[in-house]
Amino acid sequence: MLLTKDGTTRSALVVGANATWLERHAADELTRYLHAISGAEIPVTENPPAKGTLVAIGRAETNPLIADAIRTNHLTLSETYPGRDGFLIETITLDGREVLVLGGSTDRGTLYAAYALLEEVLGVGFFRDGERIPNAPTIRLPELHLTERPYFAEREDGNGCFYHYSASAWDWEDWKREFDWKAKRRVNIVWPLNVGGGIMGAILHEWGVLPQPPPPPKEPSLHERVFEYTHKLGMRIPCILPSGSSMPEAFYKAFPNCRTLLMQWSELAPYRQLHPADALFRRLIVDYVRHYRARWGTDHLYIAEFASESRVLEGAEDVQEVRLDFARAMSDALKEADPQAVWVPSSWSFDLSADDPGNPWQANWTVEEVREYLDAISLPLVVWDLWSEEAEKYLRTDYFYGHPWGFGVLHSFGAGSYLHGDVRGLINRVHRLINEPKAKNCDLFLTQEEIVHYNGFFFELCAQLSWNPIPVTFERYLATYCRRRYGAEAGKSLEPAWRHLVDTVYGPESGTVKIILDPLYWFRPDLELLHGWPEDAERSKALWARRPAFVPRLRSAVEIFLSQPDLLRTNEMARRDLVDIASQWISERFSLALIRARDAFLGQDAGAFEDAAKVCLRLLDEKTRLLASWPPYRLDRKVERERKNWGDDASRATKHTHVWVTYEEDQHSVPLRDYYRMDLDGLVADYYKPRVAAYLDLLRRKLASGETKVSAEEFDALYTPIEEGFIAAPVRSLPEGEDPVAIVRELIAAGPDDTA
């Protein structure tokens, strides 16, 4: 079946006169990519031409060609077959004409069929950080009979934190690229966009609290444009409901007798919110949903959390009773406002850690309290278990006691930009899940990363698992990933590099948010050099002791990439992968050198200390140089993009978020310090390195005087001025324009790794 020959068209894409927007979008996407592959301009038409191959896109209800094929028993396609968002790619002969059918049980399925043809048959590689388009002036298809149906009916991607950690300065093209990628990865639920900002003002005006708000702008905001585009792509968007916090003082003057709770998040300033047992709380939710539905419609999914990550300071003697008040009041309000409402409570609120009076976050839950809370919700619900791959709350709550739920992979927290994640472990965990009878009510897979555009190898795996985990094996995934990303020949050559990574940083001893094995320069150095959860300290020590074995494997991975000069010259994604792997190789060596310096200090070995200290500072310089050569890893570039949000304050605001998470100068909380740590050239050069250098100088002075102890107060006095100075100083532009591949070759040629 010929689609193109020598760069000229031999086919036409046929849609019905009543084709939906999404079906026409599928046709437009297909003709765009076929042109990129072959150079041919393939027309999209409602009237099949007399000659050439026909590509029929849609369903029987919208495309007469497909209806004829079904009526004459050439094809089976309906809402129930393949079913869900399933699709088929089928070559048939209809009335003597060669016809390729791309159809779905839903409109989304039809779009997935078009992308599957491109990716699975024609060799296009779709990735978050780029695409690989093969060159084929002649496109000849074999006989095709492909049918796919998702295992999980719902597939969500997105987390509210990524708006802060990744998307704060995105423009329309950035957002469109992100949601097009989600469509290619068959996502059908996304995290809410920021479109409800004017609703509270309108409600409080109706309640007589505030004057009438100004009319909304005539032009839609960026998030409103993205919202509309996302809906066109067939993705559902939940509505985030207010908790009754952030009310103006005028509200409390108008309703002086309303019940409130005094809350606190981390160590920041306490705030008030409506008590869920107060009648105004239910009224607020009903009115909010009414306004939201009038403006945006509804997908009937509602996110509502009580005190997620916050503590109740005043207003409730029994926290569990307030939680139950919240469950009951929210249920009643949603049933009144939207009879088809589905509540999606998040397990993130269910902190099942051992109770700790010093916990700066919410009061902890027991599994019995979780059950009582879920049972108090009196409308349909689906628990979003946001951290299934590590926290395993679904196991501790006996699969949420029979309630519908979704398996969520969080993986990358705000600091999740380094290479990490247990690839084989995730595959095995999901396979155990789908073979467990108790998990029968899990029909949702969530990918809940806080930061995107890092660890693509891990998140592409999540996308495959979310569609259908049954055929996914590590070997099959690795081969597919490399072939699509680099091409068949180069991909096969690079598989050994990724095996090195999966045996190390993407293996069972990879770091997590609990067992932190991040680059040690990201934190204030001390004499412990352990930054994970205290209960995991012994395991962290054991893992650090085995970390030297990672270094030669990472070096080998770098060398394998360097053995592909033609690919590195033509494939930007391969260059980016080389930068990331080389960066990790440097980070691992730094962490080991810092541990050696600390050990030498404690052992009063001045010579060994100086040797390790020199390695630490040299590696940070090498890291800075490499990062500066890759534009997305430059701090000055990030600051420049943030100017549209912060104007002349962009440098301070951007740096402040990396130190304290928040933008505001007066909002500092010790548990949040360095949470948004990452590798940007200016962060390493002007924040992390000065802090490491000060640490080494302090230990050097102590060593000279025979001391082996440093108090927390001494460290704080040392680091606070560095942090404050970094935030206050204008962003510095480091040298740019170097070839990252040449830098990595130079670093490899410099000699063996210093890990002893």
Residue positions per predicted region:
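Contiguous, structured surface segment used for ligand recognition
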Residues: 1-150
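Short acidic, S/G/P-rich loop/turn micro-motifs used as interaction or catalytic elements
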Residues: 18-21, 61-65, 164-165, 310-312, ...
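Solvent-exposed, acidic/flexible segments
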Residues: 19-27, 107, 168-175, 216-223, ...
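Catalytic-core regions of glycoside hydrolase
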Residues: 42-43, 51, 131-139, 161-162, ...
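N-terminal small/glycine-rich loop or linker at the start of catalytic domains
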Residues: 144-166, 263-270
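Ordered core of a single globular domain
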Residues: 571-624, 692, 696-725
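Extended, compositionally biased alpha-helical segments that mediate assembly or anchoring
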Residues: 684-756
